Amino acid sequence: MIYGIGTDICDVRRIRASLARHGERFAQKILSDAEFATWQARSARWPERGVRFLATRFSAKEAFSKAIGLGLTMPMTWRSCEVGNLASGKPTIVLHGALKDWFDARALSAHVSVTDETDYAASFCVVESL
C-alpha cells in the first residue's frame, strides 16, 4: 500500500550559487559521508558534475522527506538520508540513525527516481508500507 509520494524540482543554478557562497560547508550539510566523498571525486574531475550530483541528491532527499510526511523535521535530516546506487545504477534510499529506526518501525520501503538537465534536477519518490 502506498504510504506517501513526494516530488521535487531543484534549480541547479541555486545549488551552484550556494556552493560559490558557502563552499564545501554547503555540501557537507546536505551530503552523507559517502555522498560527500563521491561529490569531491566528481567535482575534482569536472566541477559541473559535482554541482549536478549535489543538486540531484538535494532533490531526492526533498522528495523523500515529502513522501514520508515529515519534511525536514526530526528524525529526517539531510545527512541521515543517503541516496546511493545499486550495482545496476538504479538510485536507492539508504537511511541512518534515528531516521532508519523510525522508517523500519513502520515497515516502510522507498523507491526513488532522479534526473537532471541543464538547469534543473528532479526527483520522484514513492514510499510504501510492506
Swiss-Prot record:
It is found in: Cytoplasm. Pfam families: ACPS. It comes from the Bacteria. GO terms for cellular component: cytoplasm. It catalyses: apo-[ACP] + CoA = holo-[ACP] + adenosine 3',5'-bisphosphate + H(+). The lineage of its organism: Bacteria, Pseudomonadati, Pseudomonadota, Betaproteobacteria, Burkholderiales. NCBIfam families: acpS, pantethn_trn. The keyword Cytoplasm applies. Its EC number is 2.7.8.7. Mg(2+) binds at residues 8, 62. InterPro entries: 4-PPantetheinyl_Trfase_dom, 4-PPantetheinyl_Trfase_dom_sf, ACPS, Ppantetheine-prot_Trfase_dom. This is Holo-[acyl-carrier-protein] synthase. Transfers the 4'-phosphopantetheine moiety from coenzyme A to a Ser of acyl-carrier-protein. Its cofactor is Mg(2+). GO terms for molecular function: holo-[acyl-carrier-protein] synthase activity; magnesium ion binding. One of its GO terms (biological process) is fatty acid biosynthetic process. Keywords: Cytoplasm, Fatty acid biosynthesis, Fatty acid metabolism, Lipid biosynthesis, Lipid metabolism, Magnesium, Metal-binding, Transferase. It is an enzyme of class 2 (transferase).
